[in-house]
Amino acid sequence: MYLGISSSLKHGSPQEWAQKHKALGLQTVNFPVGCDDGEDTVVAYKQAADEAGLTIAEVGVWRNTLADDPDERQRWIDYAIRQVRVADAIGAACCVNVVGTPYGPRWDGGYRENFSSELWDMAVRMIRQIIDTARPRHTKFCIESMPWMIPSSPDEYLRLIEAVDRTEFGTHLDVVNMITSPRRYFFNDEFLDECFEKLHGTIVSCHLKDILLKPEYTFQLEECACGHGTLDIKRYIRLATAENPHMPMIIEHLTTDEEYIESVQYVQGVY
């Protein structure tokens, strides 16, 4: 695997950004700029990554491309298309978003209707529109696996890949996001095996974090830093590396640079 972090770390220039990641022993990065930052800035960060020997794991969208308001929805679809084109130009492993929802105030929130046939059809059309307009050749567009919206399981991911029917659509695997039951939690080693067995050949990037069962009733899971939970991280890394020796694995959702550095050191000690 190639280890990276979602933090861009505090930096004053593209060169400092790249060197800080390299100094931590990282091999890949999340791209910290995008289509709204201008071509010169994008090129400068890409060159800095190349000079430091860092691959680019992902370009993020993180906008509601299924927003209820039609104008807002189209605005974010257009943004996603431009982000895919940036990812393609710089050779990122993927451009990634979550599917989004029109059914509530939180754009990435959990609602019953997220699992409706209406949402499914909207999502397939949206993904195809982004891919068919951007027409990437050197990257994949991905929808990250999630706990309360599609895709929320390996089987659902496979159905989505089949429904979208585009070779430019890939899997962005976040295993922790899909650990939503006692069985998946306590037997996460088996769930990891299931994910990589079923999604083999489609996975282009992974998120890396941990998960812990809280002692209070009823069933409550808490995302946490690597090593602070019960996920079989060593197995996760082994499976990802078997899928692709250069598989990006991105540590995410920590607060400070110091927390990211601590998590990096833990993962490096594991593998």
List where the protein language model places each region.
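Acidic-and-aromatic substrate-binding clefts and catalytic sites of carbohydrate-active enzymes
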Residues: S7-Q15, F31-A44, N64-Q74, Y103, ...
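Short helix/strand-capping connector loops at secondary-structure junctions
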Residues: T241-E252
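Acidic/histidine-rich catalytic cores of soluble enzymes
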Residues: T28-V29, V59, R128-A225, T230
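N-terminal pre-domain/capping segments
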Residues: M1-A93, S117, R128, R166-G170, ...
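Short, electropositive alpha-helical surface patch
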Residues: Y111-L119, I150-D165, L221-Y236, E259-Y271
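Catalytic-core regions built around general acid/base machinery
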Residues: T41-E51, M126-A134, E194-K198, R235-L239
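Short beta-strand segments at enzyme active-site cores
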Residues: F31, A57-V59, A92-G100, T139-E144, ...
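Active-site acidic/histidine proton-transfer and metal-coordination neighborhood
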Residues: Q15, E51, P70-T171
